[in-house]
Every structure is written in structure tokens, then in C-alpha cells.
From Swiss-Prot:
Keyword Repressor recorded: no
Record's keyword terms, sorted: ATP-binding, Ligase, Magnesium, Metal-binding, Nucleotide-binding, Purine biosynthesis
Gene assigned in the entry: purT
Residues that, per the record, bind Mg(2+): E268, E280
Pathway(s) the chain acts in: Purine metabolism; IMP biosynthesis via de novo pathway; N(2)-formyl-N(1)-(5-phospho-D-ribosyl)glycinamide from N(1)-(5-phospho-D-ribosyl)glycinamide (formate route): step 1/1
Protein name per its UniProtKB record: Formate-dependent phosphoribosylglycinamide formyltransferase
SUPFAM superfamilies membership: Glutathione synthetase ATP-binding domain-like, PreATP-grasp domain, Rudiment single hybrid motif
Catalytic reaction equation(s): N(1)-(5-phospho-beta-D-ribosyl)glycinamide + formate + ATP = N(2)-formyl-N(1)-(5-phospho-beta-D-ribosyl)glycinamide + ADP + phosphate + H(+)
Organism: Stenotrophomonas maltophilia (strain K279a)
GO biological process, alphabetically ordered: 'de novo' IMP biosynthetic process
Function: Involved in the de novo purine biosynthesis. Catalyzes the transfer of formate to 5-phospho-ribosyl-glycinamide (GAR), producing 5-phospho-ribosyl-N-formylglycinamide (FGAR). Formate is provided by PurU via hydrolysis of 10-formyl-tetrahydrofolate.
Amino acid sequence: MAKLGTPLSPSATRVLLLGSGELGKEVAIELQRLGVEVIAADRYADAPAMQVAHRSHVIDMLDAMALRALIAQEQPHLVVPEIEAIHTETLVQLEQEQGLRVIPTARAARLTMDREGIRRLAAETLGLPTSPYRFVDTEAEYRAAVAAIGLPCVVKPVMSSSGKGQSTLRSEAEIAPAWEYAQTGGRAGAGRCIVEGFIDFDYEITLLTVRHAGGTSFCAPIGHLQKDGDYRESWQPQPMSSAALARAEEISRAITDDLGGWGLFGVELFVKGDEVWFSEVSPRPHDTGLVTLVSQELSEFALHARAILGLPIPVIRQSGPSASCALLAHGEGVPYFNNVAAALQVPDTAVRLFGKPSVHGHRRVGVTLARAETIDEARAIARDAAEAIGVELRP
């Protein structure tokens, strides 16, 4: 896309975001900076990206007819999936029927909408190293898979994210409740799950991999801390051996080359010494990549915007040791934030409040960011800033 138009005019370059959370919000901001007309869609009103878009729509993106109608109405030049819960078969059909441009491709969106498609591609088609795994549909199959793989192991719904429905099993007593949670906690309700063997890794990373007009570029590796399958902290760069980094880039290039298209991919990997295992990939900016808002000259969101528009990415510069820490809210209500000033008193500290309209249960509502001389210092500053901010929920 060599030419860009003017928003809200006949020449406008229109981008439709399918999913309007905090990551989509940052993508929308970067697209706005490049003069793109942004349309944001999600299943609920006033989602974060809707607050910075030119127009927004509330639809069930798993409804094929509603999705077709929205695309017909808006006539976007690019469709950018920002979440998994989309009727991706419709995108595949529209790509074939009308030449609809889906980022990175409709096939990539379909394969990565659940864990089965991408795991089978990585392990069985490409031969990439992964943990042992089995897919199960019933409790009997699940129990047989746990027995075959052994404890400890992990069970996840094939369609979920942010740790929803996910459990780590370390004892026989956890087998039954983990199945129940997998059937009730996933985004798509009860259904198929993956049981994975537990890899005794030293650390896990996200390798942000950008496919763009000039080739493939890699960001510095991002280390992260997960709790209950959900991101809590991330930092960049994660120290690792040159051999492990080379292997991580090799695996990331293999999976993203197969998925194709342009855009940023978040490739999750386990590392032990010089050994690297593939875990998952998202064909879009990654939550652990929020740290790049301060750690890189071009954040993951700016890189994604440039890549999908066909703009050059000559270099990715790092700004030094940096960290992020998630702000969490628990309960019911509208979030209010106290003591933001206290969090910002330390130099090289930043805060992003996502603007989520409400909280129901457990939700990430913001992030603190910090730069320092070392990773440990940056992590401590980001944590202290997050602890300083009190998140209050009101009716």
C-alpha cells in the first residue's frame, strides 16, 4: 500500500479492527498518526480502541452474517483481527471471493484462532520442537491424556486467551477441578482442550517477529512472568545465549514464514540453556509487548502499523533495560484510579490506563512502564508504580 489517503474523505485508507481492547487501542493510535481512517468493532460498547477510532460497531464477531454485513458496509482496505473470537472462516471466504485483505492472512487468522491449528502446524507440519500434547473432547479422553503424558501437565481450552480456563496439574486431586474449569472458563464455553506435558524451562520469552516489505525483523527477546496463564510482568531485553537466540529466531522465522502476510507476530517460546521449544504464536501485537511502549523507538504497535501498510522498517532501536507491570482489578464496577501522580514521580516511568468501561470479575485495566540501568531495577520500579496506584471499582 504505497499511497495513504485522508481520513473521512473519498481518498481515505480504511482499516477495520476486529477486536477493540487495549492492544487494538494502541494499534488504532499508530494508524491515526499515519492518517488512516480507523473503524473499531467488538462485542461490547465503548471498548478501548473504539474511544480513539473514527467509527465503531458493536457486533458478535462469531456471527458470520453480522461479520459479512459489517465488512460490506465499511468496505475496508484492510481487516485487522485483534482477538481470537472471530468467525475466521468468513474471512477466508471473503478473501477468496472478493480479494479482502486480512492481516496477516485469513489462513493465519483461522489457524491461530485456536491452539489446535497452530500446534499441529508447528509440530506435525513444520517439525518444530514442542511439549508433548494431546487434544481431547471428553472427560474420559482428558483423563487418559493426563495418564499418558504424566504429571505435572497443563490443560487449556483450545479457544481461550489470557489464561482463561487454563490450569497446571501437579497432583491427582487437581485433575477433576481442572477439567471443570477448562469447560467453564474458556472464551468459547465447553469443548475441546489440549493437554500439554510440562517443560522444565529456565525462562519463557516472546520474540516479536515482524514480516514487512523489506523482509523479516526481530525485536530483542522479551522475558515475562505469568500467573494463572496471564501476563503480569514483562521486560526487555531478556538475557539469553547467542545459540538460544539464534534458535529462537530460526523457529520464529519458520512459523511466521508459513503463516505469511505482513504484520507483527508474537511468538512464545520456552528456553532451557541453549534449547528452545515453540509454545504459541499470535499474528498481532502481544500483551507482553506492552513494554515496547518505552523500550523501543518503534513500539510493537508502530511496527505492526508500518508493516501492514507496506511502509519500511529500516531499523528497530532499543532504548535500554525496560519493564512493564500489569494493573489488575477484581470485582464488579467501573474502574477509578488513585495515586497516579505517585506512580509517575520516579523518572523514566510511564502509565497507560486502558479505558475499559467496566470490570466483571478479573480484568487487566492498565500497565506501568519503566526504564532503568538494569532489568532488575526497571522491574522493581514498574512494580512499585503499579502498587502505588489503587484501582477502585464503583457502581
